[in-house]
Amino acid sequence: MTAPQPIRIGPYTLQNNLALAPMAGVTDLPFRLLCRRMGAGIAAGEMLTSDVRLYHTQKSRRRMDHTGEAEPRVVQIAGGDPQMMADAARRNADAGAQIIDINMGCPAKKVCNKAAGSALMKDETLVREILEAVVNAVCVPVTLKMRTGWDPDHRNGVTIARMAEAIGIQALAVHGRTRACMYRGDAEYETIRTIKQSVAIPIFANGDIDSPYKAKLVLEQTGADGLMVGRNAQGRPWIFREIGHFLHTATIAPEPSLEEVRDIMRAHLRDLHAFYGEEAGVRVARKHIDWYARGRAAGHALRHAVMQAEDAQTQLACADAYFDSLVETYGAEKKNESSSRADRKTCAARAAAADDDCRGARVLLCDVERAQARPAL
């Protein structure tokens, strides 16, 4: 397997070709820092409104916080007015943003109803005006996140990609669905491939990347330079580590142990409590705990307990108790399985060493020893 080539956006060469997708209500500073530690080469923050009059609010200030974040620091802005988008880009660049990302990919109704997000793809003239206004407003690189089109009958991703490159956009992230498709159906990797073939700037493929195998498949099918992971990093930030390991070694990295998952979650919760303050941090942390527990035994019990917790100490205790019980239960099972495998190997060695006359007796002895060692049910 050929290792992915480094991606360059303006003056920045990324550590790898894996990006965390911007997600409102998810990719706050604690989650971005966590995903970077877990192997993401770049992480975009939650989308910011282009209305700079709202930047004094606590919500906006938190979204503009990049304390301790490694380069390049990416801010995504959303809006439908070219001048407001230019003002927002300038404001964020002055505040330390090193890359400005334009949101034309969000399919949410509350965004599209304001003629922003992926709704912009319906109006190519407005798209051009916004791209030109933002690129001309700042000296930092500008990137664009978009979809394959407005609906299956209007896939204009290639047209907008070529327009963006000509205007000066330095990288594109393409979600493999139209706005009308939301997150339904399969991602259109063939459309992303067509977009990739139409431009020379770096392309990040986005959509349904949920495993190392899928990551490799998407790179092969799209020819993209990089991958952008969004929803599948929720409760599983180590997916970047797993994908990176597979792309470079063609081997599957071991899944994190329950102890490691517990420790990652615990540190994440503490960071959320510190970042938002206890009351808000406890509320924000609930969905993350739910994601960490997703697909695990008795996850519903954890959700119920967490929803009842109203302070950080109780929330941490509930989450710890749940994962500690999993470690105790499944850790013991693994230990017994390992002991059983060791017993079988020992028995096989004894049998092989015995001569023909007594081999049967030795095998029988191993069976007796194994039965004595097996815990009572």
What are these regions (language model features)?
Residues M1-L377:
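Flavin-dependent oxidoreductase catalytic cores
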